[in-house]
Amino acid sequence: MFLRFFCFRAGAILQIRKDKVKTMANDMLVKEVANISVDVLSGLGKLVSAYKAYTETLAAVQKQIEYTKEYKEKQTQTARENLVRKTAGTCDTIRIQLESLENTVNSLDQTLNVADPELMPCVGLLANSPEALPLELIGSVAEKFKGNRLALLALAAVAKENNKSFLEGKAVDGSGAVKQIRNKFDMLADGYPKTLHLLPEVKNDLVKLCEAYGHEIGDAADTYLGADYGDIVNLIMREAAGL
């Protein structure tokens, strides 16, 4: 009897430790998603800074009234080529970071802790409820498992009516989101600086991805970029005008 109790207790302790390890691993992966996203935002900031310097160079050339039109056009072309050359390394680095981000998100979605002690009570609550839970309550449940795609899908499977669609909507497709970000950045990098208008979209998608996994970046994104939305829009307008 004592041996059976000892084995049971040891097994329970081992399971608790395993769950703690899973939770720690999940927390580390979530932080990694945030850290990589911040690195990408900083890289995008370098593209913004480089373009600012480029426009300043063009402005200085245009001010020289003694320069011929042909000379100014040649200087503009040279400045643009230098801009693309100087930022090529930054674009390559961001591509590598986004690949790492996708791998991290894939690992996160596959290893999230569905053995969370709070999961089964919530599954039971949704399964046994005769009708959909109030929005405030289902929102609290979703917040509890924010970023845990597998847990949210498990809850959605037993949820009623609009609770089901609500929970499914909260179960972020991290892999698909990162693929979309990578595609947008590829278009941005391949056409830079003419594709500068894609930069705010990439930034916003990164912020949303982090929020989906429970890490708020918010206004700090502009700090990492070194420019706010107004600055970027101004640069986009200058590029569109050929300035």
Regions found by a protein language model. Give the residues of each.
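Detector for intrinsically disordered, low-structure N-terminal pre-sequences
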Residues: 9-11, 20, 29, 201, ...
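A long, low-hydrophobicity, low-complexity, charged/polar interaction segment common
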Residues: 118-243
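Intrinsic disorder/low-complexity signal
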Residues: 18-20, 108, 115, 230
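Short, charged, low-complexity amphipathic alpha-helix
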Residues: 18-74
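Long, charge-patterned amphipathic interaction tracts in eukaryotic proteins
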Residues: 25-42, 73-172
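Intrinsic disorder/low-complexity segments
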Residues: 11-13, 26, 221, 241
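Long amphipathic alpha-helices with heptad-repeat character
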Residues: 37-40, 44-47, 51, 87, ...
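Short, Lys/Arg-enriched N-terminal segments with co-localized hydrophobic residues
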Residues: 1-23
